[in-house]
Amino acid sequence: MLSKFKRNKHQQHLAQLPKLSQSVDDIEFFYAPADFRQALLAKIAHATQRICIVALYLEQDDGGKGILQALYDAKRQRPELDVRVLVDWHRAQRGRIGAAAANTNADWYCRMAQENPGVDVPVYGVPVNTREALGVLHFKGFIIDDCVLYSGASLNDVYLHQHDKYRYDRYQCIRNGKMADVMFDWVEHNLVEGRGVNRLDSAARPKSPEIKNDIRQYRQELRDSGYHFSGNADDDRLSVTPLVGLGKSSLLNKTIFHLMPCAERKLTICTPYFNLPALLVRNIIQLLRSGKQVEIIVGDKTANDFYIPEDQPFKIIGALPYLYEINLRRFLSRLQYYVNTDQLIVRLWKDDDNSYHLKGMWVDYEWMLLTGNNLNPRAWRLDLENAILIHDPQHQLGAMREKELHLIRQHTTVVKHYRDLQSIADYPVKVRKLIRRLRRIRIDRLISRIL
């Protein structure tokens, strides 16, 4: 059972975070990816001061093209607008996984710049590590005037539900001038002006090996950087706290760690990839032992963006959803007692051949964590992550919170027993062989740390 001293230590961490006062009327939830796309395009079209788009990638497909064209249109109509886009340096200069690197997103950014002379929409490539596998720009948020449109989504056809398929995420718009300024200033000083950051919309950009030393130093500088602001809200009022971090000792990681044990009744977690760091698993077990309820909503393996249907050619990356399911099955087998008593509720999300990308936490009715953080070892150690922690002590967001969770649960089934999940023996032959080979050389543990 969590001792009072330990719980107070966790609550003390949250109490000491600087909090910005927030009006309930200035928080808007969107519940579907198409609504998010329309809201983003409307915000861009009506912006009067600044547009700062930060995402893992802005893809050269219909969805991505619609966003970049809207940015060029806004800048052309209002030249005084400060417009900038920031994406991951490495991701922008390769094709999709398994595709050739010809005609990359960076090549497209260059063409758009050439086709729109005199209309400057800079696209910056942020290198979080010397290789994409060892760290990416996973910072999220679209800062438009005094609003932050926050989602874990990147910008392409499926995230924006441009056509038939969608990738489900969370979407909030928070109007808060102080928070928008804090985030914008941090992006300006640490990303736009960062060592090793270069424009991708210029053909004269350097090659990655040429800036390797800059990237290494830059990564250390990112580790040491954080938001600096003073809070202006009491602990009994609705407030928001922006968080940013890189590396396992970041303030963001510490806050996630301390947030979980503060649940008095119930903790709800969403993650698309079930691969929780060990210390978060320990938090969950301690909550269960002290009589609290824990709900975990994850994607079914077929709703994973890396899933390859059995009738398509198999690629190694297609083993990932199975590795995540193995993790979940092992976790449930340890905690089957709490599943039987309905204290531990695990839901699998599946909606036809759409995919699931939700992440975040809800602690009782008091705390909500909006984040792009997948709550996995990769997010914990390698990627640049951020979040917005909402404190709602008077439960003013209760209706929106319940609607969001109701819609998330809509396409889920509850796992009643760990044997409801397939075992390795049930997997397709190629997947089974690969996983057994990985286990034999113990590389599956290494993979779990970087994915």
Please give the residue ranges for each predicted region.
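Short, surface-exposed basic-aromatic patches at helix termini and helix-loop junctions that form
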Residues: Q69-R76, R282-S290
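Long, C-terminal catalytic modules of enzymes
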Residues: Y338-L451
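HKD-type phospholipase D/PLD-like phosphodiesterase module
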Residues: H10, A15-H46, D61-A263, T302-M361, ...
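Short, glycine-rich nucleotide/cofactor-binding loops
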Residues: Y57-D62, C270-A278
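Residues at the starts of beta-strands that form the adenosine-phosphate
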Residues: R50, D82-R84, K266, R289-E295
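Generic beta-strand/beta-sheet core signal
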Residues: V54, L86, I144, S151, ...
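Short, solvent-exposed amphipathic alpha-helical segments in soluble enzyme
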Residues: E188-H189, N283-Q286, L405
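Short, catalytically relevant binding-site loops at active-site mouths
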Residues: F274-L276, K301-N304, N376
